[in-house]
Amino acid sequence: MKPAPHVRSSVSDDGLILLDIATGQIFSANPIAARIWNGLEQGLLLTAIIEEIAADTGADPVVVQRDATEFVNALRLRALVEEF
């Protein structure tokens, strides 16, 4: 999965801002979501992103997987990401 071509992003220590230039809608998300977005931009698989976040934060991998999947599903619903 990768960011859709009509989406622009800005990542900071505070999190993530996404702009859908096709609709003019703006979305914001927390710093962990920003890490997921960065991983998707780099072409990483979601499983690799989840493993990295769990290892770096010490969070339960099951919880990270649940939250990451929920975030990515929200991106899909809004057509902000697309399959390779």
Where do the language-model regions lie?
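Long, charge-rich, low-complexity alpha-helical segments
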Residues: 12, 25-84
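Long, low-complexity, charged/polar intrinsically disordered regions in eukaryotic proteins
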Residues: 1-21
